[in-house]
């Protein structure tokens, strides 16, 4: 999963994940925002994980928009697709297919490659490295300096009905609500 700055081609954050699901994408996006700031907009493909209401809520809290690429239009995602091709040819191609490594080891090597190679290499479309171009625009980047604010942006929000005994269920766990007599039978928003 990767997020790329459209103008500079800087990878704001990327990592290999066991699954490409919403929670993995959310973690990568959160790290991208923590490291490189809040984007003006996020341009994604049509994948289910990018069309979720949760992503819309996260982006709304940060004050950025989400736009989805047209279906079956690979040109509209050319920059990120070109980056993935670069990962395959300049990073993954160096691996011995017989070598056993963990996901953590793979990501450690990947992060080093990103910072030491990809982010530093002069890009033919900009005549600058992605890092140099991005840093030249740094005064326009809205950083999140308070980790609590960042955590608040990325909280999941779901509705739950308070059971008669004053409990709610979230991810197969039961929680007792405050004021169970008042809230029993009512719907509440849960943030986690």
Predicted regions and their residues:
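A short, conserved beta-strand element enriched in hydrophobic/aromatic residues
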Residues: 1-34, 38-48, 69-71
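Short, conserved catalytic/metal-binding motifs centered on acidic residues
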Residues: 9, 42-45, 77, 117, ...
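Short glycine-/small-residue-rich flexible loop motifs, especially phosphate/cofactor-binding loops
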Residues: 30, 56, 165
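Short, well-ordered alpha-helical microsegments
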Residues: 50-53
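Charged alpha-helix within mobile-element recombinases
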Residues: 56-151
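C-terminal, beta-rich DNA-binding module of retroviral/retroelements integrases
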Residues: 118-192
């Amino acid at each position: 999963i990767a997020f790329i700055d459209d103008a500079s081609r800087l990878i704001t954050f990327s990592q290999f994940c066991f699954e490409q699901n919403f929670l993995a994408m959310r973690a990568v996006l959160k790290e991208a925002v923590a490291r490189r700031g809040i984007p003006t907009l996020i341009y994604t493909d049509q994948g289910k994980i990018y069309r979720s209401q949760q992503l819309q809520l996260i982006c709304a809290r940060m004050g950025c928009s989400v736009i989805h690429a047209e279906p079956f239009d690979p040109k509209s995602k050319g920059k990120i697709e070109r980056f993935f091709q670069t990962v395959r040819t300049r990073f993954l191609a160096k691996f011995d297919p017989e070598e056993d490594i963990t996901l953590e080891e793979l990501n450690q090597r990947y992060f080093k490659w990103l910072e030491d190679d990809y982010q530093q290499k002069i890009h033919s479309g900009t005549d600058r490295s992605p890092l140099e171009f991005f840093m030249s625009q740094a005064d326009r980047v809205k950083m999140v300096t308070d980790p609590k604010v960042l955590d608040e942006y990325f909280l999941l929000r779901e509705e739950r009905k308070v059971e008669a005994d004053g409990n709610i269920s979230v991810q197969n766990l039961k929680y007792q609500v405050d004021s169970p007599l008042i809230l029993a039978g009512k719907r509440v928003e849960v943030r986690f």
